[in-house]
């Protein structure tokens, strides 16, 4: 099953998440199919907190990809801000 979920990066105590499309059997930070955005929860100043390619996300959902709970909230925030 294909899933749209967060992939953790960044440094210790400074998380940075890539929003990726991956096979649900792959590890959290493992192989992925496509990167569709990022989420920076500790952005400061004028740094961008959230950037999603909503067109690609809609494409993957239309093909049957499941969306994780946190990514669903991020998509809702991104559509409200756009």
Curated annotation (Swiss-Prot):
State the gene name recorded for this protein: rpsP
Keywords recorded for this protein, A-Z: Ribonucleoprotein, Ribosomal protein
Name any GO cellular component annotation.
small ribosomal subunit
Q: Which HAMAP family match?
A: Ribosomal_bS16
Q: What Gene3D superfamilies does its record include?
A: 3.30.1320.10
Organism superkingdom? Bacteria
Name its species: Aeromonas salmonicida (strain A449)
GO MF, one annotated term: structural constituent of ribosome
Q: Where is the signal peptide?
A: none
Q: What is this protein called?
A: Small ribosomal subunit protein bS16
Instruction: Name the PANTHER family for this protein.
Output: 30S RIBOSOMAL PROTEIN S16, SMALL RIBOSOMAL SUBUNIT PROTEIN BS16M
UniProt lists the family membership as follows: Belongs to the bacterial ribosomal protein bS16 family.
Keyword Ribosomal protein listed? The answer is: yes
Question: Its GO biological process terms?
Answer: translation
């Amino acid at each position: 099953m294909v899933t749209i979920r967060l992939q953790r990066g960044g440094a210790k105590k400074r998380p940075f998440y890539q929003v990726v499309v991956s096979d649900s059997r792959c590890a959290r930070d493992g192989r992925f199919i496509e990167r569709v955005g990022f989420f920076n929860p500790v952005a400061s100043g004028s740094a961008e907190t959230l950037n999603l390619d909503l067109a690609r996300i809609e494409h993957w959902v239309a093909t049957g990809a499941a969306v994780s709970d946190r990514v669903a909230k991020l998509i809702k925030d991104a559509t409200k801000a756009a």
